[in-house]
Amino acid sequence: MRKLFLALLLLAVALPFNAAFADSIIASNAGGHAAFNVIPFGSLFGDGRYQEVYSSSLFTGPVEITSLAFSPQDTTTYAANVDLRLTTTNVGVGNLTSNLDNNFSIPLTDVYSNPNFSQNVTGGSETFSLVFTLTNPFIYDPSQGNLLLDLVISNQNQNEAFSRSGAGNILSRAYNSAGFGDGADGVGLRTEIGYNSVPEPGTLVMLGTGFLTLAGAVRRRLM
């Protein structure tokens, strides 16, 4: 009984600590929604590859990225063959080139792949209802550079457009596509990035010390 009480007490302390670290942020250039755009999720884009760079200023410390979400124009069922990869890059926002392999030096990390991806989405510039929950969450440290998304896509089932922002200093894009050729510019898809904050080592030490102190106090009371 004493062991059960102690375990439940420690769990009650740990759960609020963990929950406080789950969050999301909207990556968008100033001005918010500017237009709906079919690059890269629309069928007119065709088979292709798309990159988007996000400024490191979005985050104040290391995070574990758990999801990426985008806002479609229409309420529909969207399907495609998708592969998402992430990495850190020293290439700045607005400086991506259409030679996509030159936009990073750290190898890409596979975070989500589904040849038969299909999802019901809700239309609207602020819905962020097309959600890719990463099967391999990505640890990102903003002190090491900007965040780069690399998407390979094909077999889009419709020419669906998604919310993009105008040019700015938070995000930009580059692409190679069958439908639009190669390009790079200062705009990009507005993205909701889901993440868990990664505690600093000192925080973990303090938490561990607190647990030990609490355990000792409870043990003395139960003796």
Residue ranges and their predicted role:
Residues A19-F45:
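Boundary/junction segments of secreted and surface-exposed precursor proteins
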Residues P199-V218:
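A short, hydrophobic C-terminal helix/tail in secreted or cell-surface proteins
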